[in-house]
């Protein structure tokens, strides 16, 4: 059984059991911060934009962005078929794709590419980020992603063993340097939804 197949199995089980709704609730505050940052920028630009959500789950973030007046195209992609089934059942007008995210190759480009809790499931996230920057992201577009699994969040260190899934861990500065190495500009990071007992979601973003 391949590595990505194992990850898909876990998320299919979560979608079938309704755990995707819990994930939506648990990630809502961090994703709201991320989208507020990205959508404020799009509003200031004042032009219509396209949106891609990598690892979209049941599509809740994709739907929220689709509702934005300036959004003219929203696409959500996930490797778990049952997540995509759930997303399509709630579709407003956005589009959902079931695909292996390690090899996914869209034929269209986007102004805003967003991902929450996905990239560390890849064996080689740097390769994907290079493809995003070189082929998927429009000039002037933004890549933004959020991670709860990172070195400084010690609470997350046990997750690979708990879920029996390999995960790719880096320090915050290593993620920043990785994005800079792809050619992204103005790379910044922050901790979203940080509390006294939670290290927060690590958000990394840069523009093309």
Show where each model-derived region lies.
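Conserved class I S-adenosyl-L-methionine
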Residues: 1-43, 64, 151
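Class I SAM-dependent methyltransferase SAM/SAH-binding core
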Residues: 52-103
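A conserved beta-strand element that flanks and buttresses the S-adenosyl-L-methionine
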Residues: 114
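A short glycine-rich, Lys/Arg-flanked "PGG" loop and its adjoining helix->strand segment in the class I
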Residues: 126-139
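Conserved beta-strand signature within the Rossmann-like core of class I S-adenosyl-L-methionine
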Residues: 140-148
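Short, glycine-/aromatic-enriched active-site segment of Class I SAM-dependent methyltransferases
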Residues: 148-166
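Short alpha-helix
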Residues: 167-182
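Conserved S-adenosyl-L-methionine
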Residues: 184-195
């Amino acid at each position: 059984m391949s590595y990505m197949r194992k990850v898909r199995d876990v998320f299919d089980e979560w979608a079938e059991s309704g755990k995707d709704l819990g994930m939506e609730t648990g990630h809502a505050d961090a994703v709201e911060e991320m989208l507020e940052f990205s959508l404020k920028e799009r509003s200031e630009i004042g032009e219509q934009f396209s949106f891609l959500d990598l690892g979209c789950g049941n599509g809740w973030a994709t739907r929220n962005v689709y509702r934005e007046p300036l959004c003219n195209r929203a696409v959500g992609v996930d490797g778990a078929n049952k997540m995509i089934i759930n997303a399509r059942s709630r579709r407003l007008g956005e589009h959902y794709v079931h695909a292996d995210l390690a090899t996914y190759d869209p034929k269209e480009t986007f102004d805003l590419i967003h991902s929450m809790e996905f990239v560390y499931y890849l064996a080689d996230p740097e390769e994907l980020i290079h493809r995003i920057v070189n082929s998927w992201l429009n000039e002037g577009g933004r890549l933004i992603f959020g991670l709860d699994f990172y070195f400084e969040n010690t609470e997350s260190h046990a997750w690979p063993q708990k879920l029996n899934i390999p995960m790719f861990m880096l320090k915050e500065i290593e993620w920043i340097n990785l994005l800079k190495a792809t050619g992204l500009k103005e790379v910044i990071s922050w901790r979203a939804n940080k509390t006294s007992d939670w290290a927060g979601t690590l958000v990394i973003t840069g523009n093309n």
